Each structure stands twice: as C-alpha cells, then as structure tokens.
C-alpha cells in the first residue's frame, strides 16, 4: 500500500501549469510541512482539462501535459487569492496508509485494478485516495467546497495588530492551540497563575473566538448542558445567562466577552492552521510550522489575502482544540450530480435559506422541499426550525436519537440573585460538581439536585463516563434497573405525542441510556405531526446517494431542492495530535501518532514522555463528564500549576524549563487507569453509538483499547487525586530540567 499526502501549497488561480510545478517556499521540505506530496488536479464538473504533477528525485515532473486551468468561479463570483480546490484532492496526513477502495463516482473494478497495480504505487489515483482520506477543510466533492471556507464575517479580528507575528523569528512562551472555551480557560488560568498576556499566543483556524460556537450557527443551535454550569467563568465575569439553556449566539458572544475581559484579542492569531509541531532539543522549544489562511472580508467572494506560511517557536504548547472541529461528511454517491443546493450544518448557508444566526427566519425556504440527512443532536435542534419555513421536510433516519424533554426557561434576575449568587464564592464549580455527582450515581441520598434536568435524571450515563459504583460486580444489573424507567417513560412519551403509529415506532430508541449521547429538546417529536413533515427510516447502510433531483434510498427517489447534512462531527482518533490535525514530532523525532498507536501512556492524561513542554486535555486516562467546560477548566488549572511551579523553581526563567513525565511516572499512571477498565464493562451491551467501546475505542488489542479509556472511577475521583498531587508539592512523576548555556541540570 502506498502513502499519499496532501500538499498544502497548491496552485494559484489561473496559473499556467505547463510553465512549472506548484510554487513552494524556499525552505519547504516534506519533513517540515508534515506531509509528503502527491498532487492531482482533475476535471471540474467535466468542463476543465487537467494536469498531474509528481515530485520524483527532488524534481517536479508533469505526467500529462494538457491545457491551462481557468480562473475558479465560486457562487458566481471570481475568487481571488484562494487556492484552487481540486475536484478530488489527495489529503492524507503524515504516516497514514491509504488502501484502494471504491470511488464515490463508481470507478469500475477494472479501472481500479489498473490504477493500483501500476509500477509506481506513489501515483495512485486521487479518486481512490479521496474516499479513504477525507480532509477537514477540503472535501472529496466540489459541491461541498464551502467546508474549506469560513463563511462568517469578521467581527473580532484586528487585522493590523498581528503583522509582527509573521516574522519567522517570532517566539512565544506559551502557545495555546484553539480559541474556544478550552483555549480561553487555559489562557485565563495561566494569567491567574501569574503569567502575562505577552507570554501567551492563541492560534485558531477560525476567524474569531468561540471554537465550535464560532463555526456552528445553524437555526435552533443551543447547548443542551445547563448554561449556568457550561458557560465558563460566569462568576469571574459577572454574566447572567439569558436562559437555562442559551442559544449558540450567546455562547459565542460570551467567548468574545471572556477574551475582552482578559484583553486577549491582541494575543490571538486567527485564520491560521498549525501543520507541524517539532521539538527543538538544542533550543528547548517547539517549532511551529503554520499556514495563514488569509483575512477575508467576504469569504464567498474572496478577500484581501494575507495568507502564507508562518514559522514561530514556543517554549510550551497546549493542544486545546476540542473534539467538535471536524465536520463529518458522508461519502454519498452522486453528490456532484445533484442539481439542488447542499450544505453541512457546520457551515449554514443563510444566503440560501434566508435569515441570520441572530434571527433565523428562513423565508427563502418557503416553497422549497428540504431533505435532512441525520438525526443526531444537531438534527434534533435544526429539524423543528426547518419545519417552520419549508414547504416540505423529509428527514432521513438510520438510527433514532434518544431525545429527552428539555424544560428551558428565561433566567429570572431575582431568582438568580436569591439562588445562584447566594451560594457564595465558588458557586459555579460547586453547582458543576453537583451535576457531575448526579449523572455518575455518586450523589448522597440527601444531596439536593441543583440542576434538576434531563441529564441529572439519567444517571445510567455513568456507564459511559465512569463513577464510584462502576467497579462493583453487580453494576450492570444496577444500571439497567436504573435505566429501565427512563426508557419506558421515553417510549410512552413518543407514542402519546406522535399521532402516526408507524412514525412513532420508528422514532423510539431502544438502546440503553449510556450507549449514545442523549439529546434534549422541546418540540422535536411534535414536529412529526405536521402534515408536510415525513420521516424516512433507512436500513443500517443509510442513504444510498443523490441523484440530479434528490435523495436515493435504495431505488426510491425523494425529490428535494435542498439537502442539509446534519451528520455531526468526526470524533476520529483519540490521539491529541491527530484530533487537532497536527504532525507532532517529539524529542526523538517520533510522531505522537506513532507513540499512541499501541495505546497512550500519560501522566494524569495531560502529558506524555518524549514530548517535553506539551500538554493536551482529553479523555484518555483522564476524568470525563458530560460538561466539557468543567473538564477543560480542571485540566487548565492543573497545567497552570505545573508550569507555574516549574517556573518558580527556575527562578522565573520560563524559557529554561523542560518538563515531561518520567518513564516510571507515566507507567504508574497508565497502569492505574487500565486497572479501572472494568468500570466501562456495561458499554459492551451497546451497539453502535458515539460513547461505546465498539465505536470509539475499538481495537483488536485489548490492552490498546484499555489505555484509551477514561479514568474509570469518574470525574470526582480524578479531581481528588490531582488536588492531592498538587498539595503534596513534590511534582512526583515529572522529569523537570533547567537549561543554561552550559547545558541542563
């Protein structure tokens, strides 16, 4: 099998390919970029001739010499300073092995055989590679090219204040990858630990703060975790959420408010993607190779450019890019033949639907037939909104979502003052931990249920996240007994709400409450009583594909004008580098992905040996809960302590510090985490679901799978261990060195 790699520096618009290969920076090498190269530019909707290039023996060679590529036209506008997007670009991360597979356009078996059995395996067709290696911001279909662009107007970027960061010699002390709630929490906790704003640099491919709440702006968007515990730093900012579950716009503006309060706007580098992090042992620093995507005042018409390669260094690096950053696009046959409109919920097209994120009145859908593919948490929120405006709505469901009732309400200022603020200092953390206790069956009988919502009424979810009772031999019987009333109540609610019996039965989720992340909504099931809304239950294979007129399920065609892909995000690998799509090379030149191939070894789930001064909040060997903001906050607090104490020991000279786990330290922690794997035994009773072993932790090697699992005793146990470790002051399990001009000590 061959290895194929996407080349990030691709053709400029209208460039005569016959005149030479793609332009590369003078210092470009595959090792620095994190990719090897295979470039294939193919026909665009059958209209444009194409050329292939390959690099062989350090020289570019043209494989087939044809004509020039015309300027690329997007949505009727000439796109300037935007890389040409090949029809089926090859985009394969470093070290990923690509095997032949059926092409989405239906390449014949004979053709595939010729392509894969050629004398030079390095020139495999992009048609084959494209299906195996689906990129994040580059798609195998020209129809879905909008996933490669930021559709939102600039509101938070000072485009003039970042020019100094473009110099290759730029150095920052602490690099934070991600500017969502996770990245902001790390920045704030580091500032509170005594570091200055000038010590920090936040880098994000988005055009502003917010992370998943920056990219997602679809109608009906809200967080289904109570906003009083999910929205970080409420106590410090003094912000009162407008509702128990606030809409997405408020979450995004809250992220911007956090950045403003701690004056982080000038310490953020947006529309920038880090491709490679490489440890420089001699310089005791990370070398970051990045690509600036440019600043666009109107993403659909191009912009003022400003993109290009960027290299800088950092003493410490924190990967805080989160898990919901890679839109999942189904490999649908016939996408490019569909004559209607299509987009993903992560890049909502209000130009087509009408409305805006602040006022999603989709008046342009009146008279339109809309098809929604997917029934996960995103679809549950967006389907009722689409039903309000469309002429006809067809929902295509493979497996039903587990949807509980969400009782949202406006926040009463009097209640807020008399109940929330009255709890005193630390109220948000206490409320969060109360929530954690109830969803992990760790609450004492006398404990008041402060959040009191669908989550805290579904304690069987403990089987997916760990808890104090999970280690008991009879836990599976216990959790099934706890879950049975919830399951029966959910079935009764659907049957009493949905008038059509066939539709009602199709909407019933029979899985245990811990097998798939639950959803919560007001009015989802009622939507299916509307005369213009239909539910199509597919088989396990899902939708067959698209035709020029609509969506195919088997041989049946459902004609639609718009296809909405509510297919969620690709959770992908549990390796932090893979999840962030960064090639991370450690002190021995070993890629993090390679080290994690046999299962991770970590200290506290936030560091791994061989990758000095690198931190990564995640789920492997760490405590988890449904409230990801709490997880980020606890990790940020812990990492800030480690860096702060090490800096104090070094006399304040942060650039001299080199920190990594000892071999014994990470072995001990990993052993302790693996010893608690029985806490997740109940997940073996599940089928396919985003929290099951079969889906997220599947491995032919049981030990590898066990190393990827969270801390089995739950979040409270994990936090208690970390607090005791910090209180001891010994920094046990860490190898801390202080570099000087004479070496390290």
UniProtKB/Swiss-Prot annotation:
Membrane-spanning segments: 174-194
Topology within the bilayer: Single-pass membrane protein
Associated pathway: Secondary metabolite biosynthesis; terpenoid biosynthesis
Localization: Membrane
Binding site residues for NADP(+): 222-224, 375-381, 398-399
Record text on cofactor binding: Binds 1 FAD per subunit.
SUPFAM superfamilies per record: FAD/NAD(P)-binding domain
Gene3D superfamilies in alphabetical order: FAD/NAD(P)-binding domain (3.50.50.60)
Residue positions the entry lists as glycosylated: 65, 627, 645
Cofactor: FAD
Bridged cysteine pairs (disulfide): none
GO molecular function: monooxygenase activity
UniProt-listed Enzyme Commission number(s): 1.14.13.-
Catalysis performed (reactions): protoaustinoid A + AH2 + O2 = berkeleyone A + A + H2O
Domain of life: Eukaryota
Site (Transition state stabilizer): 517
Deletion consequences: Impairs the synthesis of austinol and dehydroaustinol and accumulates the intermediate compound protoaustinoid A.
Keywords per UniProt: FAD, Flavoprotein, Glycoprotein, Membrane, Monooxygenase, NADP, Oxidoreductase, Transmembrane, Transmembrane helix
GO cellular component terms, semicolon-separated: membrane
Chain positions recorded as FAD binding sites: 212-215, 224-225, 230
Family: Belongs to the FAD-binding monooxygenase family.
Record's miscellaneous remark: In A.calidoustus, the austinoid gene cluster lies on a contiguous DNA region, while clusters from E.nidulans and P.brasilianum are split in their respective genomes. Genetic rearrangements provoked variability among the clusters and E.nidulans produces the least number of austionoid derivatives with the end products austinol and dehydroaustinol, while P.brasilianum can produce until acetoxydehydroaustin, and A.calidoustus produces the highest number of identified derivatives.
Protein name (database record): FAD-binding monooxygenase ausB
